[in-house]
Amino acid sequence: MPQRIGYIFDQICTLDNLIQADLEARKNKKHFGVYPYGIRIFDKNNVDNCLLKQLLWQLDTETYENQPYTVERRKTDRKWRDLYKVNYYPTHILHHAVMRVIYPYLTSRMTRHSFAGIEGKGTTQAADLLKFYLKDKEGTKYFLQEDVCKFYPTIDQDVALSILSKVFKDRKFLRLMDKLLHHTPSGLQIGFYISQLTANYMYTLVDRLITEKLGAKYYVRFCDDMVILSNDRCFLLKVHKEIKDLVEKVFHQKIHDDYILSRIGYELRNDTHRKRQRGSKGKKYRLSRLSV
């Protein structure tokens, strides 16, 4: 088992890290050559990095407090979702500052089967891996697909912190993460920069259950959407039960009752696949276009 990592807070709490976090946080934010209002106000008031120095002092003295947020109801992928928005300064910059430091530590401990919140590993790469798996026609006669009910809103914040504490031993950092994860009354929220990677890393436990303990050969996960291929239907039923038990007992979440277990009827396109179109029918990531 890898050793826990220390001295994380000291890497986060530097002026240089906050400056770089600001630069990363504003990437691709210009509309018609103009930054949004929050960034413009920050730039106007951040003379000689005075605001970043103030944030640095708050972090160092542990006096930082979570700021108000807004919630916008929006329909995406045929579902209504609550999108949470925080102020650019200090919250969004701080989220980037934290992720800049912990990202390599978390991603290095993930398995190759995970495809969310990781640079260079999105839906296209997940579909490519599925296509590669499907070349073994005898070993991929059946597929199991399932996901978690209301994934982000039902994440247990204390469980998320507990899992992070198995990677990091820096108490000051863990106290900061405790505050950031508990920004809202419950769940990890869509729109918070720290949410996706944190949630994705949590489910590394599921990845290791499926591939190491149960020995599944063909498996792909995009956040909470999981696809397992096999030539044994009974094995997939066992996998479903084990996943369900782990998700309920450890994460205190629930697998959708309408999971799919079916014989494969046709493959993904051999040479190309189109990017999912907004508003299209079917599963969110089109990883299961496998059954008739």
Language-model features and meaning:
Residues 253-292:
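A conserved non-catalytic segment of reverse transcriptases
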Residues 55-79, 169-183:
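Reverse-transcriptase-like RNA-dependent polymerase core
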Residues 1-53:
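Non-catalytic, polymerase-adjacent accessory regions of viral genome-replication enzymes
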Residues 1-9, 95, 99-156:
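Active-site-proximal segment of RNA-dependent polymerases
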Residues 79-111, 185-213:
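Conserved pre-motif C helix in the palm subdomain of viral-like polymerases
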Residues 128-223, 227-250, 262-263, 284:
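Conserved polymerase palm-domain catalytic core
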Residues 40, 69-79, 111-124, 150, ...:
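Short, glycine/charge-rich beta-strand/loop segments that flank catalytic centers
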